[in-house]
UniProtKB/Swiss-Prot annotation:
Keywords: Membrane, Photosynthesis, Photosystem I, Thylakoid, Transmembrane, Transmembrane helix. The chain crosses the membrane at residues 12-34, 54-76. Coiled coil: none annotated. It is found in: Cellular thylakoid membrane. It is a multi-pass membrane protein. The keyword Repeat does not apply. This is Photosystem I reaction center subunit PsaK. It comes from the Bacteria. It holds the Pfam family PSI_PSAK. GO terms for cellular component: photosystem I; plasma membrane-derived thylakoid membrane. GO terms for biological process: photosynthesis. Belongs to the PsaG/PsaK family.
Amino acid sequence: MLTPLFAIAPATVTWSPKVALVMIVCNVIAIAVGKATIKHPSEGAKLPNAAFFGGMGHAALLGTTSLGHIIGIGAIQGLAARGVL
């Protein structure tokens, strides 16, 4: 019953340093965009070393890294489909 669906599912990429680099870059970009666009980034619980994360609070960092992972998944799948990864 599910076999035809498995046939059209894209192949996943094995984890490698290239894949890790793409994910790191996407997260850094998302943190930079979040730092520039979030109105009150330091609200909520504080991080142990807030200066390392640009003074962002826990909620802002969690939100930006979540967005970074979503962007990273799309970038990794797109680059894998093109044969770059």
